[in-house]
Curated annotation (Swiss-Prot):
Leghemoglobin that reversibly binds oxygen O(2) through a pentacoordinated heme iron. In root nodules, facilitates the diffusion of oxygen to the bacteroids while preventing the bacterial nitrogenase from being inactivated by buffering dioxygen, nitric oxide and carbon monoxide, and promoting the formation of reactive oxygen species (ROS, e.g. H(2)O(2)). This role is essential for symbiotic nitrogen fixation (SNF). It comes from Lotus japonicus. InterPro entries: Globin (IPR000971), Globin-like_sf (IPR009050), Globin/Proto (IPR012292), Leghaemoglobin-like (IPR001032), Leghaemoglobin_Fe_BS (IPR019824). Specifically and strongly expressed in root nodules and at low levels in seedlings. The gene is LB2. GO terms for molecular function: heme binding; metal ion binding; oxygen binding; oxygen carrier activity. Pfam families: Globin (PF00042). The modification Nitrated tyrosine is found at Y30, Y134. Belongs to the plant globin family. This is Leghemoglobin 2.
Length: 146
């Protein structure tokens, strides 16, 4: 079964909820990543000098990650696969030595952040929709890395 219009709508509406409190949700996202993988701090230039609460670039990067996942959902609905609009994403991930386990950490942090953003609207269907969209994005990035 392919990605459905309902899944796309779930990702879209919850992405808007995420953006409504971008500062707090961005800090939460990177805090969750660093709790699971403290060494990942060195992969993000904007986290090297300080933690997630003191980084001016943190919001922009979090919005990009969530926006790319939102775009991945739309692509999965439209054509059943994800292609990267920014071809440099693969090279950047290679340069930062990103490996498979890092994608799993980011996915978990992404799902927990969406859950916090939507509150009682969280559901298994919403989790699945974001998970499938993120997996599509991750697969496209991994393909660009090789």
């Amino acid at each position: 079964m392919g990605f459905t219009a309902q899944q796309d709508a779930l990702v879209g509406s919850s992405y808007e909820a995420f953006k409504q409190n971008l500062p707090s949700n961005s800090v939460l996202f990177y805090t969750l990543i660093l709790e699971k993988a403290p060494a990942a701090k060195d992969m993000f230039s904007f986290l090297k000098a300080s933690g997630p609460t003191h980084s001016p670039q943190l919001q922009a990067h979090a919005e990009k990650v969530f926006g790319l996942t939102r775009d991945a959902a739309a692509q999965l609905l439209a054509k059943g696969e994800v292609t990267l609009a920014d071809a440099s994403l693969g090279a950047v991930h290679v340069q930062k030595a990103v490996a498979d386990p890092h994608f799993a950490v980011v996915k978990e942090a992404l799902l927990k952040t969406v859950q916090a953003a939507v509150g009682d609207k969280w559901s298994e269907e919403l989790s699945t929709a974001w998970g499938v969209a993120y997996d599509g994005l991750a697969a496209a990035i991994k393909k660009a890395m090789s």
